[in-house]
C-alpha cells in the first residue's frame, strides 16, 4: 500500500516537518479523510502498525490519526478499539502513546484496553 509505505517513510526519515518531503502527502491524506472516511484511516493505521514498530512512526500515529479518530469518532470506534487491543499487542502499544483528549467514559475504556491486565 503506497499510503502506508509513504507514511512510514516520511516519519522514519524525519520528513514529517518538511512539507516538501516526497512522502508528506501521506500525512495530509490522514487529515483529509479523518472526518468523512474514518474506516479507511482505521484500516491504514492497522496496516502501519503491522508493518513497523518504529518509535517515531508509532508516536506520530498516536498523536495524529489515532487521536483524531478517537476525538471525532470515539463513540463509534470504542468497541473496535477494545476488540483490537485484546488481540493485538502492537495496537495496545499504540494506545499507550495516546494522550487523554476525549470524553471521560471513552477515555476510561481506552485506559482499560491499553493495559496488559
Which positions does each model-derived feature cover?
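C-terminal partner/receptor-binding element of secreted or periplasmic proteins
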Residues: 114-117
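Alpha-helical solenoid scaffolds in large eukaryotic transport, assembly, and signaling factors
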Residues: 1-111
Amino acid at each position: 500500500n503506497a499510503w502506508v509505505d509513504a507514511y512510514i517513510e516520511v516519519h522514519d526519515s524525519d520528513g514529517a516537518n518538511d512539507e516538501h518531503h516526497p512522502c508528506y502527502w501521506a500525512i495530509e491524506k490522514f487529515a483529509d479523510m479523518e472526518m468523512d472516511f474514518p474506516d479507511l484511516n482505521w484500516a491504514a493505521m492497522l496496516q502501519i502498525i503491522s508493518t513497523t514498530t518504529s518509535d517515531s512512526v508509532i508516536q506520530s500515529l498516536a498523536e495524529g490519526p489515532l487521536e483524531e479518530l478517537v476525538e471525532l469518532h470515539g463513540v463509534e470506534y470504542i468497541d473496535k478499539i477494545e476488540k483490537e487491543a485484546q488481540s493485538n499487542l502492537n495496537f495496545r502499544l499504540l494506545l499507550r502513546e495516546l494522550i487523554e483528549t476525549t470524553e471521560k467514559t471513552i477515555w476510561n475504556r481506552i485506559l482499560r484496553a491499553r493495559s496488559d491486565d
